Amino acid sequence: MEKIRVYELAKQLNVSTKDLMSKLKDNKIEVKSHMSTLDKDQIAKVKSFYEKQKKVQTSQNNSKSNDENKKITNKNTEKTTEKISTVDSNKQNNSNKRFKPKHPRNNDEESVSHFDKIKHKNKSEMNEKRDLNDKKKNKNFKNTKNKNSNNNKNSKNNKNNKNNDHNRKDEAIKHETKEPKKFIIQPTITVKDLSEKISVSISELIMKLMELGIMANQNQEIDFDTASLVAGEFDVIVEQDEVEDFDDDDVFNLDFEDKKEDLKERPPVITVMGHVDHGKTSILDRIRNSRVAGREAGGITQHIGAYTIRVNDKKIVFLDTPGHEAFTAMRSRGAQVTDVSILVVAADDGVMPQTIEAINHSKAAGVPIIVAINKIDKENANIERVKTELAENGLVPEDWGGDTVLVPVSARTGEGIDDLLEMILMVAEMEELKANPNRLAVGTVIEAQLDKGRGPTATILVQKGTLKHSDMVFSGQASGRIRAMFNDQGKQVKKAGPSTPVLILGLNEVPEAGDMIYAVKDEKEARNYAQKIKDHNREEQIKSSSTMNLDELFGKISDGETKDLNIIIKTDVKGTIDAIKQSLIKLSNEEVKVNIIHGAVGGITESDVNLASASSAIIIGFNVRPTQVAMDMAKNESIEIRTYRVIYDAIEDVKNAITGMLKPQYQEEVLGRATVRDTFKVPGVGTVAGVYVNTGKVTRNATVRLLRDEILIFEGPVSSLKRYKDDVKELTQGYEGGMGLENYNDIKPGDVLEAYVLNEVQR
């Protein structure tokens, strides 16, 4: 028998790698990781241990089944005894029914005593016979009432006394036999829903609420205490539905395990991780022969991208994750859906903090790691130093006696890229990656954003099943029918199988990045699942917001001079919100607390300024700009709005402001805004925009931001400014003219051009 790795033996024994490694340690077999190899003697020793364990479990299961058979026999005996006693009691009841008493009063007493006997019977017997006994009682009672009225016509006093006695017994019987209705409701419910639940008209319910001093319309939500109080006025009991902490997989049971015979081979999903600027996107550029890095601000990947390539007629899916520590959550999501992790380390820089973090993410996900040592073409490259630092962090190279695959590469020259791809396919083949394509799809949302023209969009990675055009899906509280799907090259596709990244359209709102996405049978099922999650999230938000406000209030009282820095975040994509949030909250210290009071996708609007004014907050925009109305309102309300294109600048500014070191050298002055009415292509010059100046002025030496739906598209200097055929230094409000942007031609009618200058401020 040849040597095999730990994780391969775990698959053969049908146990988890973690469990196998613990058993190896118990048997004094030393292994470093799941990639370690075992010899023939060690394999035989482990297999014999698990065979003994299986025999013990089998004997225990047999003994348990014998005990259960005995219990079933005893239960059957008890049921037979209960049936016999039930027959006897029925006979006794029938004999009582045939007996006609001489005096009505005695008959009343027997009816009541008969009810008391039934009341104290076993609960199971009560449930079977309650309706029959009630009918008998009512029948006996009516006969008694008739006899009372006929026998006592000549005696008025006797009649009154006996009728009063009868009424008391009638009320007692009704009180004991009639139980109030019970309903289960959510912790919060609208007045309309409550009226339908307890079968009371809306007008009656609103009137009763007004009597209790509560003014509410039919669409207004009331809490459980209020609902319980008003329901009690209608002799109805309501109970609160317990909202449990749940995971999508546990509650919906949609991500079930497939049968082995249904599984088919699927492409591997590769996550590229590493420290910022170590060359992750550049390596993907070389592999895909595209220029993604050139389009990112500062050459840094801002959002997760998913790409499919072909190598030797086999597909490989790459996830490109940002390297900065602000994107911890995004990298963690990438590790959860990946099969092989590529750790990029610069040969001239070595292991950095985010490199260690990426190692931990990959180890926690239990995926094999391939180290790509990049930038080996540089003069100060030191591969041996990188190997030493990797070994110190638990990744021992193969040529040093370890099990970590190291591939020296150069993204600039292309050296070693083919070797890296071969190693990826080799490791993926050892993993035996399979999935069932013939089932409803299950996947993960990699990124999501709101597009003005197409609505909510989501980049997803299908993990199981096949996602098809027109499928009903839900992800978190978002749901809808897929109207269109696009692959990573922008081409429309009709279906996507396992390990396929696609951009989908058709959801009713933007899902959360990292959420699972499920395909279901019909629209009703998708809406129900999404609504259930929405209700759960709303309850959690109500709880957290009320608790947070109280903590904030008491915190200020106890801390005395504690200051809070409230921040509102607006970004162009949803995944960036969490990244900025985590980074800014970490900046809190003993003197200043950073509170993120709101975060959303889209441009900065007047509602954001109103919220900032009410909560004394500053607004931070990332790749977005405020509307003109929002800018004017912020100026009047003295609200600070800061916009950024690179996340590090935002973090550094807030950090410096907290520590009191922020001394701005330049202050931005917005000169004016112009709207693009038409565009013209001029040979040798490029695209020239015909603009109309709405506010302020546009000058020749100004820097211009091109905004499309308040999203920042381009920022750069003005290349030309004309009025008719003449070059001018400025265009003022109410005038039209032509404007060209330096090295940028993708201008469209309806775009807004915002001109500004930076004025030096004395320190």
Curated annotation (Swiss-Prot):
Residues 320-323 are annotated as: G3. Residues 274-281 are annotated as: G1. InterPro entries: EF-G-like_DII (IPR053905), IF2_II (IPR044145), IF2_N (IPR006847), P-loop_NTPase (IPR027417), Small_GTP-bd (IPR005225), T_Tr_GTP-bd_dom (IPR000795), TF_IF2_bacterial-like (IPR000178), TIF_IF2 (IPR015760). Keywords: Cytoplasm, GTP-binding, Initiation factor, Nucleotide-binding, Protein biosynthesis. It is found in: Cytoplasm. Residues 410-412 are annotated as: G5. Residues 299-303 are annotated as: G2. Residues 52-178 are annotated as: Disordered. Residues 265-434 form the tr-type G domain. CDD domains: IF2_eIF5B (cd01887), IF2_mtIF2_II (cd03702), mtIF2_IVc (cd03692). Residues 136-145 have a biased composition (Basic residues). Residues 146-161 have a biased composition (Low complexity). Residues 86-96 have a biased composition (Polar residues). Residues 374-377 are annotated as: G4. Residues 65-82, 105-116, 123-135, 162-178 have a biased composition (Basic and acidic residues). It holds the Pfam family IF-2. PANTHER family: TR-TYPE G DOMAIN-CONTAINING PROTEIN, TRANSLATION INITIATION FACTOR IF-2-RELATED. NCBIfam families: IF-2, small_GTP. Belongs to the TRAFAC class translation factor GTPase superfamily. Classic translation factor GTPase family. IF-2 subfamily. This is Translation initiation factor IF-2. The lineage of its organism: Bacteria, Bacillati, Bacillota, Tissierellia, Tissierellales.
